[in-house]
């Protein structure tokens, strides 16, 4: 037995052999203090303090946001698509430095799609290639090492190639097709707003306030959405990994954020 539930609802560490008992929150405060002091000197003092407070007060959070919840049956949604003979074709779009394409292909394969590897060079060589696909997903990673900014080098490669620009512009304008950008792919698409209908209020992605690359697990709650990708998933709380050096959104005003949500 490594632990028991307490009536007080506060996690405690008890070591009977040496008659030691302390709240976990107190021990975590001791454990996290040195990291906080180092971060305060190295990074942004405000973000360092914010993270420190979140850690030592984690036991006071609303429990709803600590436990992942599914408000839909995964098998119930995917079964009707997985059994189809003619699966929709999706392009797993990548560029030099992108590293999340294999996991993305596997995810879409499990969701009932027929996945195809597509590099930007393929579109440049054959602009008509995109006509074959029902959807396109721009994957995550570090295209061109993010030297020009997150996703910007990838976007510029498309912008400054007439054939690729026209091909993707046509694809984005087709109401019978869809595009998804994840991680670096999302940052890349935010730099192609000029050719994506309905993206006027999309944000820019700029450096994190901490001035550091942030890799964390967070919980997201899915609101009501018109997106087909979130169909029947309303109110679900899912754990996701965020890993960005430029993950802060920048918009003209708060109304732009609301208008950007589908």
What are these language model-derived features?
Residues 1-89, 97:
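Intein/HINT protein-splicing elements and their conserved insertion hotspots or analogous self-processing inserts
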Residues 142-227:
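Cysteine-nucleophile active-site neighborhood
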Residues 129-137:
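Short acidic/histidine-rich motifs immediately flanking catalytic phosphotransfer sites
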Residues 2, 127-128, 165, 169-170, ...:
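Amide-donor transfer/coupling interface in amidating biosynthetic enzymes
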Residues 95, 140-142:
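Short glycine-/small-residue-rich Rossmann-like dinucleotide-binding loops
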Residues 102-117:
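Short helix-loop-beta junction
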Residues 1-21, 116-122, 202-212:
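Beta-strand->loop->alpha-helix junctions that form or flank phosphate-binding loops
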């Amino acid at each position: 037995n490594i632990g028991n539930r307490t009536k007080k609802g506060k996690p405690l560490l008890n070591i009977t052999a040496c008659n030691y008992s302390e709240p976990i929150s107190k021990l975590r405060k001791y454990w996290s203090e040195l990291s906080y002091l180092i971060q305060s000197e190295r990074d942004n003092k405000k973000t360092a303090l914010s993270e420190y407070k979140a850690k030592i007060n984690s036991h006071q959070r609303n429990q709803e946001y600590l436990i992942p919840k599914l408000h839909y049956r995964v098998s119930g949604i995917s079964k009707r698509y997985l059994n189809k003979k003619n699966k929709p074709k999706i392009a797993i779009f990548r560029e030099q430095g992108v590293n999340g394409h294999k996991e993305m292909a596997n995810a879409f394969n499990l969701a009932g799609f027929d996945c195809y590897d597509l590099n930007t060079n393929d579109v440049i060589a054959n602009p008509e290639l995109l006509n074959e696909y029902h959807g396109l997903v721009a994957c995550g990673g570090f295209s061109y090492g993010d030297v020009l900014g997150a996703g910007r080098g990838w976007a510029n490669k498309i912008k400054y190639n007439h054939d690729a620009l026209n091909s993707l512009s046509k694809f984005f304008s087709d109401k019978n097709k869809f595009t998804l950008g994840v991680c670096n792919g999302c940052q890349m698409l935010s730099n192609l707003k000029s050719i994506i209908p309905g993206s006027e209020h999309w944000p820019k992605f700029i450096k994190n306030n901490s001035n550091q690359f942030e890799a964390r697990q967070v919980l997201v709650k899915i609101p009501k959405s018109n997106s087909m990708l979130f169909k029947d998933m309303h109110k679900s709380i899912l754990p996701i990994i965020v890993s960005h050096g430029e993950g802060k959104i920048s918009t003209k005003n708060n109304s732009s954020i609301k208008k950007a949500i589908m």
